[in-house]
């Protein structure tokens, strides 16, 4: 505390608020990047789910369509939130206890609400997507014979015969797919990846805290007060709160 620090090496001199902003910005940019990263993983999950149904020869079933649509919805909504966060970016930051304030110089910061919405939405879906893969695959991913049994001349021909699910697909491709999906669903690495995808960038509860802390809930209450004929209502409250209404043309 008593050491001499040259002024050119002083970054903060009593502006303690920037310390909190630094932590918030780290999380914010991480969550923004997640809104691009996780949709890309969603593309892999979607392709895996579609192939699992095809290998099992159930790809025309209605429940498969529903599951694929669910993955697409989550993927594209997460991407849309990240894209919107970029489009609504401004040189401003949310400062606890103060609200959104100009922050620079010149760095455009993605919109906090949409960063958190995209991260929370796609993060919460991680284990649901794993459940869909497990459901479409069946138990074969956990019980599939070892590869050495397929090259064994005594057991190989019978294994190829009895593990064939779709007559329109080469059985060798089917076997290779189940090994691939087994690595995703049944391996230690697969489990670690799922936990990382769920908590990376901040657990969902952290996004929920950020969203409800920073979102202008009061303006929505004022609008409903106006609609309901209560005192303290404001028909224009929501228009004042929407981020795109305050953008510079």
Q: Model features per residue range: what roles?
A:
Residues 1-76:
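Glycine-rich beta->alpha junctions and the first turn(s) of the following alpha-helix
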Residues 43-44, 56, 80, 97, ...:
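Long, contiguous internal "core" modules enriched in hydrophobic/ aromatic residues
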Residues 53, 75, 79-82, 126, ...:
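A structural signal for well-ordered alpha-helices, especially hydrophobic packing surfaces
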Residues 65-69, 102-105, 109-116:
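Short, charged, amphipathic alpha-helical segments
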Residues 69-91:
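Loop-to-helix element that buttresses phosphate recognition and phosphoryl-transfer chemistry
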Residues 88-106:
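Acidic/histidine-rich catalytic neighborhood
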Residues 113-248:
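Alpha-helix capping/hinge segments and adjacent helical runs
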């Amino acid at each position: 505390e008593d050491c001499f620090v040259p002024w050119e090496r002083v970054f903060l001199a009593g502006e303690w608020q920037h310390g909190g902003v630094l932590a918030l910005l780290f999380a914010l940019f991480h969550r923004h990047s997640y809104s691009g990263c996780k949709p890309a993983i969603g593309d892999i999950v979607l392709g895996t789910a579609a192939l699992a149904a095809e290998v099992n020869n159930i790809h025309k079933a209605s429940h498969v369509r529903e599951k694929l649509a669910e993955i697409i919805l989550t993927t594209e909504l997460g991407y849309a939130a990240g894209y919107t966060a970029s489009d609504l970016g401004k040189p401003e930051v949310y400062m606890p206890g103060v609200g959104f304030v100009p922050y620079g110089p010149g760095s455009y910061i993605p919109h906090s609400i949409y960063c958190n919405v995209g991260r929370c939405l796609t993060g919460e879906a991680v284990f649901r997507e794993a459940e869909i893969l497990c459901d479409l695959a069946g138990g074969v991913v956990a019980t599939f014979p070892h590869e050495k049994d397929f090259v064994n001349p005594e057991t190989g021909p019978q294994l190829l015969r009895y593990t064939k699910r779709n007559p329109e697909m080469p059985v060798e491709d089917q076997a290779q797919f189940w090994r691939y999906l087994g690595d995703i669903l049944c391996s230690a690495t697969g489990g670690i990846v799922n936990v990382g995808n769920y908590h990376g960038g901040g657990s969902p509860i952290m996004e929920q805290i950020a969203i409800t802390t920073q979102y202008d809930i009061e303006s929505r209450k004022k609008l409903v007060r106006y609609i309901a004929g209560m005192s303290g209502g404001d028909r224009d409250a929501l228009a004042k709160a929407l981020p795109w209404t305050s953008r510079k043309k």
